[in-house]
Amino acid sequence: VRLCMDRGGLSGDDGPTHHGLFDIGYLRHIPGLVHMQPKDENEFVDMLHTMAAYDKGPSAIRYPRGPIRGTAVKEQRELLEIGKAEVVADGADVALIGLGTMFEMAERTKEMLEAKGLSVALINPRFIKPLDTAVLETYARKCRVLCTFEDHVMLHGFGAAVIDHLHSVGIHTPVERIAWPDEFIEHGKPETLRELHGLTAEVATSKVLARLG
């Protein structure tokens, strides 16, 4: 079974019933599922290529309505290693983990935190399931705070999966989550709704700084 989850995340002008903010919660419990979300168009092509070649169990890709970043699509496709995250930048104080469309917000948060003199790691997880547990554990032990970003409700989402894993291995580094609240989100422009519900780089920066004390 291969699932392409269109409108994964906030759907904006399509109306409140079209927001795809619950799918991680109802898919991540399926045994053996490979669940992916790309940060840009190139990665989306690679994930489709990887999905087509993967035959060991069910797989799914969640992707948004409209463009992701406007990246020109490359000609050469690549098979992604299942469950392997991309460490975009190393850091020692804070690790930011930006899933899919929220990677850009993580990038902006990184710039703001670095302006405060902090050493900030930036991670593109690629896989919701299986998680790259080695990368997660490395940065949870190395950094003082982790912060996850996802276009999904907080309950049973990607950040919850990260917390579940770290708790299971006895790592108690604080994890701040930037995600949608446990409610039905109204109709509106994505940027307006993100401002209204606190899904911005400014809010993320404030929350991380508060965790650092």
Walk through the language-model features, giving the residues of each.
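Short glycine-/polar-rich loops that comprise or flank the Walker A/P-loop
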Residues: 1, 32-33
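Thiamine diphosphate
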Residues: 4-20, 53-213
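Internal gly/pro-rich beta-alpha loop/helix module
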Residues: 13-30, 37, 41-52
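Short, structured coil segments at secondary-structure junctions
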Residues: 30-31, 171
